[in-house]
């Protein structure tokens, strides 16, 4: 039985995420999230791993948890919007895309995503 702590699991998952092994990254990140469910860095990394492995519903759940806990986290709103769009929930996605774009008008990627959703 492993005695790895949340930080070690987060570090391992982050390394796998950066290496492009998204499915494998979710395993230690899920374990880290179970140990530290309120750690935003772990939840964000897990959401990214789910999104990049096309597990969009699970990604949306992670980013929604971040938004609930940290409503001014522009990146969480942006990622939640992207995840919701991939699940076909465009109306919900528009709301989060608009929030992210309004929070960070300097982010051209946020603006482009918001504009694309508004015209679709």
Regions found by a protein language model. Name each.
Residues 3-35:
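Alpha-helical segment of the N-proximal tetratricopeptide repeat
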Residues 19-30, 53-65, 87-99:
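Structural signature of tandem alpha-helical TPR/SEL1-like repeats
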Residues 74, 82-109, 115:
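TPR/TPR-like (Sel1-like) alpha-helical repeat modules
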């Amino acid at each position: 039985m492993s005695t790895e702590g949340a930080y070690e699991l987060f570090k391992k998952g982050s390394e796998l995420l950066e290496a492009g092994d998204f499915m494998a990254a979710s395993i230690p990140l899920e374990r880290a999230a179970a140990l530290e469910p309120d750690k935003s860095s772990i939840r964000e990394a897990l959401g990214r791993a789910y999104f990049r492995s096309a597990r969009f519903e699970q990604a949306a759940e992670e980013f929604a948890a971040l938004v609930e806990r940290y409503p001014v986290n522009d990146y969480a709103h942006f990622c939640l919007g992207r995840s919701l769009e991939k699940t076909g929930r465009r109306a919900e996605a528009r709301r989060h895309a608009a929030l992210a774009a309004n929070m960070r008008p300097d982010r051209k990627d946020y603006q482009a995503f918001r504009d694309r959703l508004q015209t679709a």
